[in-house]
From Swiss-Prot:
It holds the Pfam family DctM. GO terms for molecular function: transmembrane transporter activity. InterPro entries: DctM (IPR010656), TRAP_DctM (IPR004681). It is found in: Cell inner membrane. Belongs to the TRAP transporter large permease family. The complex comprises the extracytoplasmic solute receptor protein DctP, and the two transmembrane proteins DctQ and DctM. This is C4-dicarboxylate TRAP transporter large permease protein DctM. The keyword Nucleus does not apply. The gene is dctM. Its main location: membrane. It comes from the Bacteria. Keywords: Cell inner membrane, Cell membrane, Membrane, Transmembrane, Transmembrane helix, Transport. Induction: Expression is maximal in early exponential growth phase and declines with cell density to reach a plateau in the stationary growth phase. Induced by the C(4)-dicarboxylates succinate, fumarate and malate. Positively regulated by RpoN and the DctB/DctD two-component system. Negatively regulated by DctA. The DctPQM carrier is more efficient than the DctA carrier for the utilization of succinate at micromolar concentrations, whereas DctA is the major transporter at millimolar concentrations.
């Protein structure tokens, strides 16, 4: 009865248009008040526990780092470097946009931020060179999802907090899948470009390539600092996020000098707004997850699945279906916090590696970001291009098939996610 009330109330509130965060919090709070022996105080305690979770402290720092990198002109230099590397190939500007998304993803940890930073520059450049606007918008919208797969990743931080999994291992596990997805997108773009006879830029000289690499160096160094620092043990992922924020501010203000000190309050305010919005969603989702845990739903489902005799591949198929459906209607962090505690104990029973499960969930969240009606990347792409939302959806959906094929690869070939952590002795 309790669980039926919880989920029916959640779906009812979402159906009548109540914001997702409020729906999660309200359904969880009413369930506790009406059916649980817990006191009203537990509501406040659970909500405030979010703000003191050490792992989640990485989120505002990564958001701040991405804000400084975007405002400070790092994205433009990364795009110039990507164009210098692959622009001479047929379809090179589109391939360069994917490469730029991969590079910026390694700095920001956010898919919408990656789309906004790269799309605002790369799509306009493609249109000027004769590419259809819809082609460029579809590519950047999909490639921008790499922002939560290539480390650092805010969604990975949330999964780690929900399941008590190592953030460092998740970051390392995301490297190979992120590079593989980027490579697959590039190959498909090249094939399409050959068929459609899309233009190529003149090959740059070695001097020009070195000049673009030198300008992008300070941005590229941040990737080495984050991953190198975590793997070497110099600092934890949360400390790495703080280092990234300070480093990004230093580069934007004193190295590239694309920002003035007077612009810092605006950057801090914008990243603060994003942090508050995301943490409000996370706090309410954690309250909802608390109700699930109190009612022992994950344990009950795990026992039921074990009794059914589901094989690991069948369970992972169910996981993907549930996550793909949820991704159409909910924000990634909320999905992770609600469903990860349910799937996690079942995966442990079936011998599925928690890191592998985490990467599968992240890839599903990538797909959710580009599927209507609430795919955030679609709205960001529409905003930076000026295209109607319907046209943006039509531009992005053909590329969605690539992500679905990639999801199958990641799901049923665990080595894609686990090979690098195992090789580095992090298993």
């Amino acid at each position: 009865m309790t669980i039926l009330f919880l989920f029916l109330l959640l779906f009812l509130l979402m159906f009548i248009g109540v914001p997702i965060a409020v729906s999660l919090g309200l359904s969880g709070a009413l369930t506790i008040l009406l059916f649980s022996p817990d006191s009203v105080r537990s509501l406040a305690i659970k909500l405030f526990e979010t703000s003191e979770h050490y792992t989640l402290l990485a989120i505002p720092f990564f958001l701040l780092s991405g804000a400084f990198m975007t405002t400070g002109g790092v994205a433009r230099r990364l795009i110039d470097f990507a164009n210098a590397c692959v622009g001479h190939i047929r379809g090179g500007l589109a391939i360069a946009a994917v490469l730029a998304c991969m590079l910026f993803a390694a700095l920001s940890g956010s898919s919408p931020a990656t789309v906004a930073a790269v799309g605002s520059i790369a799509i306009a450049g493609m249109v000027r060179s004769g590419y259809p606007q819809a082609f460029g918008a579809g590519i950047v919208c999909n490639a921008g999802t790499l922002g939560i797969l290539i480390p650092p990743s805010i969604v990975m931080v949330v999964y780690a907090a929900a399941t008590e999994t190592s953030v460092g291992k998740l970051f390392i596990a995301g490297v190979v899948p992120g590079l593989l997805l980027g490579l697959i997108l590039m190959v498909v773009i090249y094939i399409v470009a050959r068929v459609k006879k899309l233009p190529a830029m003149p090959r740059v000289s070695l001097r020009e390539w070195l000049a673009s690499a030198r300008k992008a160096l300070w941005g590229l160094l941040l990737m080495v600092i984050i991953l190198g620092g975590i793997y070497s043990g110099a600092f934890t992922p949360t400390e790495a996020a703080a280092v990234a924020a300070v480093y990004s501010a230093f580069v934007a203000l004193f190295v590239y000098r694309d920002m003035r000190l007077s612009e810092c309050p605006k950057v801090l305010l914008e990243s603060g707004k994003l942090t508050i919005m995301l943490m409000f969603i996370i706090a309410n989702a954690m309250l909802f997850a608390h109700v699930l845990t109190t009612e022992q739903i994950p344990q009950s489902i795990a026992s039921w699945v074990t009794e059914l005799g589901l094989s690991p591949w069948m369970f992972l198929l169910v996981v993907n279906i549930v996550l793909l459906i949820a991704g159409n209607f909910m924000e990634p962090s909320a999905i992770i916090l609600i469903l990860a505690p349910i799937f996690f104990p079942i995966a442990m029973e079936l011998g599925i590696d928690p890191i592998h499960l985490g990467i599968i969930m992240v890839v599903n969240m990538e797909i959710g970001l580009i599927t209507p009606p609430v795919g955030l990347n679609l709205f960001v792409t529409s905003a930076v291009t000026g295209m109607p939302l319907g046209a943006t959806i039509r531009a992005a959906l053909p590329w969605l098939m690539i992500l679905l094929v990639f999801l199958i690869i990641v799901t049923y070939i665990p080595a894609v996610s686990l090979a690098l952590p195992n090789w580095l002795g992090m298993s």
